[in-house]
């Protein structure tokens, strides 16, 4: 970036909403756009939506903006304020490029821009990062105002974000979070999908997914490690011959922001993978980024190529440009055995672009969901029944199918599909958390720790990989047998991270680690910054999909069996606890993964800068951020969590956790 470009960039950041309006702007071609949202507002509510949008602007601009915003609402179902899109390219820059009084605030600006980078975001011009509706902001005025506040604030202030809206900067103190984010916090009785549609159209609430609305998304890498762990362990659990992953076939769907990790994970795990995707822009975007090997548009050609790859035990990934139902049915007709099956379509949002029904083309479906949502819903339900029936035919032959926490089984059951167990009390297939991620990772405190090198230098990321590997190898020498497999998998992951070319957007890394691993890795980074070995500070974070961050009965807490799976104390306590233990920013969201009204989840970001204060904060906050969830899982009588929290108490004498007594089953039956 030249000096002139940098000056112009910084000027546009600091001016916020410009006093002189930019010229009207059309949507760009060549990028994916959000589908038209359904027309849900009454005429009176449409007037209110327009009034709400205009309050960001002085009254003398209303006559120019009102018809434009009204047209956006009619055409797209939302008011995005396209004319306020910034003139500069949207991507994460080195932290020193951001005009800021507070370095912590500058790091948040970097993370926000990464979430909206067209190489990273699903629908960048609608401010959607992933999942079809996972928003960073509701409109571009909110983006501009937020960036202005961040450029001005000091470390004695906190910016408060209400569902994308910057409510204001309030006095606080240096150890308080710089930003507190909430997304979709609504009265529980008003948390149905149509409530989101209405409130989002009014501009008063948004669905932040997980790392979208919390400024912590790092591209598909953010889920690829967990997906690799899931695929590897699914193979191990079902490998009766001991032949390993080579030649195993994995069928799934979705090449969006999160789901796009699946083919890369399949390659790393060593299987043949087929991932169906109806959106050509998404499929070819992942192919261009090197996240999927081949894109095939004919299901017969796909079948032949997959049969050949399975025969030679090739580790290869195929994207099928079409509907996954067609894949399941074609493979059934061809007698092609599928070892593993799942789905990562955005079924948390089935009626507004999260799931495209079989039998409808992509554009046809987009038009119908906006113009005739009731008819579209009928097609979705029919497709889910057909989808489940095809999966059932494969599982009858021995396929291992698991729900990937995207509400597939939930929405299929609501559509009347044959997905319930024999007594009708649960689903016939497990979620991946029930079988794999919960008992093998979360109960032991392992989850998706991540970091971003704010210098933007690949060599900084390479050094952090080396430091993290050194820490894990040292901890591995004394690791108990209960966690040696997890440690070994994570060491292999970090050693291969550079070769696997995972970076899309910022210089970031994902690594599953437990509390001890996270704290020691973070301290190693902080020491390297202090010693001048790293060129800039590091942002620490995690996915909300973690040990403590999310209460979700159909995903993260689906292996909680004491009746508390539908409670949300853990996620809310985590949000509050991170706030006063040193997080730079914190977030709490309604929804995420399984859907609005189905989940409560939260996350954090922490800037470490080589200081003693940073070391104090990282030790305090990271310890709590993991052990809170282990304690809850232990109280639910999860065996691995009981072991893990006892070990944590031995390592930290100040930690005292209430442990469960186990009642005798026969005694209870006699009572």
Features from the language model and the residues they span:
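Residue-level detector of anion-binding/catalytic polar loops
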Residues: 272, 337, 400
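Long, compositionally biased, glycine/small-hydrophobic-enriched stretches that function as flexible linkers
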Residues: 1-201, 205-218, 373-524, 528-541, ...
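Catalytic or ion-translocation cores adjacent to nucleophile or general acid/base/metal-coordination motifs
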Residues: 208-232, 236, 246-249, 255-313, ...
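Glycine-rich beta-alpha junction loops
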Residues: 280, 322-325, 344-349, 405-411, ...
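Active-site/ligand-binding-proximal alpha/beta "capping" segment
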Residues: 317-345, 352
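Short, solvent-exposed amphipathic alpha-helical segments in soluble enzyme
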Residues: 267-269, 332-337, 417-420, 529-530, ...
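Short catalytic-loop micro-motif centered on adjacent basic/acidic residues
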Residues: 249-252, 316-320, 402
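Solvent-exposed alpha-helices and their adjacent loops that cap or buttress functional pockets
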Residues: 152-154, 170-174, 189-190, 240-245, ...
């Amino acid at each position: 970036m030249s000096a002139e470009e940098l000056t112009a960039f910084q000027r546009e950041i600091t001016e916020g909403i410009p006093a002189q309006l930019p010229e009207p702007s059309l949507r760009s071609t060549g990028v994916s756009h959000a589908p038209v949202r359904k027309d849900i507002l009454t005429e009176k509510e449409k007037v209110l939506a327009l009034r709400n949008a205009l309050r960001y602007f002085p009254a003398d601009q209303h006559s120019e903006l009102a018809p434009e915003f009204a047209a956006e609402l009619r055409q797209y179902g939302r008011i995005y304020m396209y004319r306020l899109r910034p003139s500069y390219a949207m991507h994460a820059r080195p932290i020193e490029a951001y005009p800021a009084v507070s370095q912590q605030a500058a790091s948040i600006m970097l993370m926000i821009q990464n979430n909206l980078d067209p190489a990273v975001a699903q629908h960048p011009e609608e401010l959607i990062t992933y999942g079809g509706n996972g928003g960073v902001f509701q409109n571009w005025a909110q983006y501009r105002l937020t960036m202005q506040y961040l450029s001005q604030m000091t470390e004695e202030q906190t910016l408060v974000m209400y569902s994308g809206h910057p409510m204001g900067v309030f006095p606080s103190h240096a150890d308080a979070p710089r930003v507190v984010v909430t997304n979709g916090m609504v009265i529980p009785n008003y948390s149905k999908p149509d409530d989101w549609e209405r409130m989002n159209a009014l501009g008063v609430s948004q669905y932040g997914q997980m790392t979208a609305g919390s400024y912590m998304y790092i591209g598909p890498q953010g889920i690829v490690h967990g997906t690799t762990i899931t695929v590897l362990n699914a193979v191990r659990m079902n490998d009766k011959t001991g032949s390993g992953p080579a030649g195993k076939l994995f069928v799934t769907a979705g090449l969006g922001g999160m789901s796009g990790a699946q083919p890369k994970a399949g390659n790393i795990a060593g299987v043949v993978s087929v991932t169906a995707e109806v959106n050509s822009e998404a499929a070819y975007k992942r192919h261009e980024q090197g996240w999927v090997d081949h894109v095939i548009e004919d299901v017969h050609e796909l079948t032949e190529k997959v049969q050949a790859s399975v025969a030679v035990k090739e580790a290869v990934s195929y994207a099928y440009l079409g509907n996954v139902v067609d894949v399941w049915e074609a493979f059934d007709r061809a007698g092609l055995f599928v070892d593993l099956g799942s789905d990562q379509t955005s079924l948390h949002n089935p009626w507004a672009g999260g799931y495209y029904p079989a039998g409808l083309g992509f554009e046809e479906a987009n038009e119908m969901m906006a113009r005739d949502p009731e008819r579209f819903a009928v097609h979705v339900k029919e497709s889910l029944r057909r989808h489940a029936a095809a999966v059932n035919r494969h599982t009858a032959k021995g396929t291992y199918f698991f729900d990937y926490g995207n509400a597939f089984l939930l929405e299929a059951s609501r559509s009347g599909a044959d997905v319930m167990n024999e007594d009708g009390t649960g689903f016939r297939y497990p979620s991946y958390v029930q079988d794999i991620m919960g008992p093998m990772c979360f109960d032991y405190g392992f989850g998706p720790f991540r970091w971003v090198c704010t210098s933007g230098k690949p060599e900084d990321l390479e050094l952090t990989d080396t430091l993290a590997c050194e820490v894990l190898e040292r901890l591995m020498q004394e690791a108990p047998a209960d966690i040696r497999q997890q440690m070994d998998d994570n060491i292999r992951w970090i050693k291969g991270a550079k070769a696997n070319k995972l970076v899309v957007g910022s210089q970031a890394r994902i690594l599953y680690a437990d509390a001890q691993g996270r704290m020691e890795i973070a301290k190693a980074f902080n020491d390297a910054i202090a010693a001048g070995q790293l060129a800039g500070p590091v942002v620490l974070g995690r996915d909300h999909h973690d040990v403590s961050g999310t209460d979700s009965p159909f995903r993260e807490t689906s292996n909680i069996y004491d009746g508390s799976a539908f409670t949300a104390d853990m996620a809310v306590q985590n949000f509050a606890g991170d706030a006063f233990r040193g997080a730079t920013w914190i977030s709490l969201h309604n929804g995420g993964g399984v859907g609005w009204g189905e989940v409560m989840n939260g996350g954090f970001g922490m800037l470490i800068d080589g200081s003693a204060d940073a070391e104090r904060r990282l030790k305090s906050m990271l310890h709590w951020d993991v052990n809170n969830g282990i304690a809850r899982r232990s109280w639910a009588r999860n065996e691995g969590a009981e072991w893990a929290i006892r070990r944590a108490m031995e390592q930290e004498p100040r930690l005292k956790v209430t442990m469960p007594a186990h009642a005798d089953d026969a005694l209870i039956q006699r009572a």
